[in-house]
Amino acid sequence: MKTNVAVFFGGRSVEHEVAVISAVQAMNFMDTEKYNIIPVYITKNGEMYHNENMKNIDEFRNIPALLEKSQNVTMVKQGDKFNIVELKKGLFKKVISSVDIAFPVVHGTNCEDGSVVGWFELLGIPYASCDVLSAAVGMDKAVCKYVLQKAGVPVLDCVQFYAKEYVAKKEGILKEIEDKFGYPVIVKPANLGSSVGISKADDKDELISSVKDAMNYASKIIVEPAVTELRELNCSVVGDTDDCETSVIEEPVMTGKILSYDDKYKGGEKSAKGSKGVKGGETAVGSKSSGMASLSRKIPADITDKIKKDVETYAEKTFKALGCNGVVRIDFLYDTAKDKVYVNEINTIPGSLSFYLWEPKGVKYKTLLDRIIELGFKRARTKENLKFSFDTNILENSMSFGQKGSKGSKI
């Protein structure tokens, strides 16, 4: 019997389109002899729709037309089953399909930050990705730094502040940044990915402009010193806290001061034929090099054995410190002047699920997807042995609690 895998993708995020690309790509590589694949598209306003044709990226060229011919759905628990049901008026809901495991392919705020998997946890359905805590910590760049520092993983120092705080204490915050780091600095929204809202500031005017831009995307901002002699390195990790392994290491190719959104997701347009030392990619979704995989990159990165070992060690430490599950990608800053690496951020649901970092190790995308799903089921089996309630019911005596009103009673 095949396993029913519901792939949830899209979402209320500035990285919505990237998630669509990643998800369609993944669905086209899943083993159809093992899985029934159920696409569930989450719109930018949070509605969910199902259509079997959502496995074809061309359908998303006209989303209103796609939704018009799709079913508005949600997922519910009915008895001991999890079902995708059509949302219609009336007592009885049409069951589209039962679901054995949920597979989220979402990126960014309101999605990758634990919001979607929190819903899965509430329902109690097995799911194939990081849990709520690791996803939430991984999304908040400031909190993630604090956790990793405690775990002995090198990260850059930062100044963090909130938008309202900045408006009230602007000059004081700017002075703190200048006194602590000088220039240049990097300004980032604290909880976005894909390089959205990130910019480099070489002086005070640019810092003010960068903060203003970042506040368009998040209310919490971080500023950190810029590494001037910089190379960026990425490494994927797959597994769980019991056992995990690292992929090959890549070096993305930057076209500007920092690795931009266009570098990550439009790089294939300029490198479709590839070039010496840089892996280019086709841009057609469903091909091996679309989405994050279209980024111009060097695989493997041309680095020393020492740096390679450092990246692999800190990637595993980061994975375990956050309690990750499934596949993640950890991005590093390599300060060539100091010959030192720092963890920049973790992507708990990475673009293209980082399959392109596993293929050089002989792991096919189909095999990687199998493992991610197996890890989701493994975690669910482990949870079945844990207690989540007691066999007592204090509400049996609730009448006595309610006599004096809930505010005056003590339980």
What function would you assign to each model-found segment?
Residues 3-9, 13-28, 92-97, 137-229:
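Active-site nucleotide/adenylate-binding loops and adjacent lid/helix of ATP-dependent enzymes
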Residues 43-46, 88, 239-242, 335-338:
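Short acidic-glycine loop/turn motifs at beta-strand connectors
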Residues 1-133, 137-139, 143, 162-172, ...:
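ATP-binding N-terminal substructure of ATP-dependent carboxylate-amine bond-forming enzymes
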Residues 202-287, 302-306, 341:
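Phosphate-binding site of ATP-dependent enzymes
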Residues 3, 8-12, 290-298, 302-411:
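ATP-dependent carboxylate activation and anion-phosphoryl transfer catalytic cores
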Residues 37, 126-127, 155, 185, ...:
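Hydrophobic beta-strand scaffold residues
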Residues 38, 221-225, 233-234, 323-337:
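A short glycine-rich, hydrophobically flanked beta-strand micro-motif that places a catalytic Asp/Glu
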